[in-house]
Amino acid sequence: MAENRCLIRLNRHTLAVTIIFKKQCADYGPRLTMQGSKHGSDGAQYAFPTWRKCLILTDACFVVFTSSSALCSMFPATAQIAAELSTTVETLHIANACVQIAMGISLFVWQPIRSFIGRRNAYLLAILTLFCFSIGAALAINASMFIAMRIIVGITGTFLLVAGQELLAETFDPVARGAAFGYMQIGNTTGLTIGPCIGGIIVSFTRWRIIYWLQVGLAGLGLILSSLFIPNEKGKSETVHGSISRLAALNPVNLLKPLVYPNIVITGSERCPEIQHILTSKQDIACGFLVFFQFIVLTSIPHIINPRFHFTTPLVSGLFYLAPGGGFVLGSLVGGIVSDRTTKRYIAKRNGIRLPQDRLNGSLPMWLGFMPVSMVIYGWTLDLEVGGMAVPIISVFFAAGGIVVAFNGLNTYTAEALPEHRFAAISGKYIIQYGFGAVSTAAVVPLIDAIGVGLVFTICAIISVIGGVGVFLVAKYGLQMQNHRFSSRV
């Protein structure tokens, strides 16, 4: 095959890149496209009217809210559950960590299911699983049964997030995609915070099992809405055929391939896997840091807030979740706007050329400013017992908002950088992400008991700065990283 040349000339406001693919790329097929392209649709499959897009977005947000609330709604009821099921609070904390580990590795289960029956059918099956095993959790007669039901419920959550992000990335144009992801993030984060509030209210007036019966109702409604509004994939076959294709679909390495490469800047077509599977491990680790922060805040609230302010009921400590919840909601709204505006600004600077990592620049103030400062204030005001209740509430509000603003750019970046392999790219992110979440969920309470809440959140602030530096390097020098890696592969 004759050599292919892709040349983008950028001087003061643009970027000079020359990529030459020689005959060695012939084995991967004749077509190669650049992700740094004009800012039109980058592989969007759907041309739905606005009202249909709104229905798809609403359903995706509601389903994500349902699955995330299933993860956290029992936090205020942990002591009551432990007492009724004859176990310990520590055992349930470890079980919560196991749920997050299951969430991370669950994509190895859902990826072949999705390949065999299609994304829409797999999506509906995941919601049905959430529905059925929430019933099992509500009817649990001992701790073992309850933990098993919790883990199976958790297995569905990550796939619903991944499939939802993949669907929104195909439905919305790049310049509106950040806002769509922001609304979906609202569903996720409000589930993580409103869920514990609802759980605290329920367990204060009735039995903890009602939490799961409410979950059953939400999952049933989500199943009905998804059956009506979630479309099939268009433009490509959803299922695999033939023995070789079926074996390939069962290969777990497909989800790990993207983690090999240092960065995404230029992606190839579906016939050039060496270039398609270029995912930033730095970005995945950054997402892991954010989930680490998120669950340190959420898991530790009953442990540090109750003794600090002498709360004695789950109702009051559950209401404290409204502070980070408000930050999550505001951050989701602001994050989408910041992400899209940053993308538009860089498109204008390059005369219409869009690179996926541009939107990461919008989250740098969160990494290097809002999050570390807020975490230090939150941790030390609780540790030193100063500032009353107002300062921790305000500081955790801003810390939570910063987490979600940073999340928006990273999530959107992952989903749009590999348009032909979105599922694998997003899945790799969640494998790492929930590994960090499991560590924070299991370790935060013993760590606070050992070194104090002030030092714990100081460590989080330091990690935030390190993560911010990594995101800055990806946003600023991602192209050079990609060119170096690509040259070594070709």
Curated annotation (Swiss-Prot):
Gene3D superfamilies listed in its UniProt record: MFS general substrate transporter like domains
Superkingdom classification of source: Eukaryota
InterPro entries, A to Z: MFS (IPR011701), MFS_dom (IPR020846), MFS_trans_sf (IPR036259)
Residues passing through the membrane, by range: 55-75, 93-113, 127-147, 151-171, 186-206, 210-230, 285-305, 318-338, 362-382, 387-407, 434-454, 455-475
Glycosylation sites per record: 361
UniProt GO MF annotations: transmembrane transporter activity
Family: Belongs to the major facilitator superfamily. CAR1 family.
Protein's recorded name: MFS-type transporter ppsE
Protein species of origin: Aspergillus oryzae (strain ATCC 42149 / RIB 40) (Yellow koji mold)
